[in-house]
Amino acid sequence: TYNDNAMINVMNQLRLIYEQKVPFTFIPEEYQTKTRAAFDKGVECILKTQVKQNGELTVWCAQHDHITLQPTKARAYELPSLSGQESDEIDILLMSLPNPSQEIINSIEGAVKWFEKVKVEGLKKEFFTNEEGERDYKMVACTDCKPLWARFYDLETNRPFFSDRDGVKVYSIAEIGHERRNGY
């Protein structure tokens, strides 16, 4: 799972260990070697799970099936999708690797190209207090705002979508409840 950056957080810890970074300077060399091997297997998994659309590398799903490596559902509101959230941390990790292979370079470039293609422009979050006195937000048009990326994109169309605890895919964040809307 890449969900909530779980795997990337672990890989960053593994890297600190095999590079003997503080606070892991005391780890014996035999464990550093094992840790490096585990990290390298993680990179292999990242490369194998990168989703292709029409033969082009894109990004990753938050959750992949452990056998088929295909995008799969996690929690009820986390449908199979391309992830605009977890994928950025995956790509940043790959970008940080010294002397990357051509396969890693292609992976990075595919993800960057996808992020450029699907960025959402002309919208920003506007916060307000709702009728129950809770902090909430809505999306409003703007002309000079920075681009945004959705957390979930349709696997085939790249259209941003949202889902509530009922697992129903909708295309406006206003269509989901306060709890999930403010949990994205």
Regions found by a protein language model. Give the residues of each.
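Solenoidal tandem-repeat scaffolds enriched in leucines and small polar residues
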Residues: T1-L14, E19-P23, I27
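Solvent-exposed loop and edge beta-strand segments that line ligand/cofactor-binding
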Residues: T1-M7, K73-E86, L97-P100
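Intrinsic disorder/low-complexity detector
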Residues: R15-F24, A37, K41-E44, E116, ...
